[in-house]
Amino acid sequence: MKLTVKCFATLMPLTPPGGSLEFHGTDICDLLRQLSIPESEARIIFVNGIGVEKDALLHDGARVGIFPPVGGG
């Protein structure tokens, strides 16, 4: 299936070229493995603009945003 993926902040270099990815898994955990992103480094994940857990299933055409842990203060 084809996904649009955008990684943010420190994960930005792991965004697929052009943001498009041919995905061969079923869920967010599979996607993180395919992108070589450790699960601990993907703290906030959106699919089609909705926050999801790492066990969320993905479907063809989904737009995925992956954010690392953030801090501030």
Set out the residue ranges of the language-model regions.
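Ubiquitin-like/PB1-type beta-grasp interaction modules and other compact soluble beta-rich domains
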Residues: 1-72
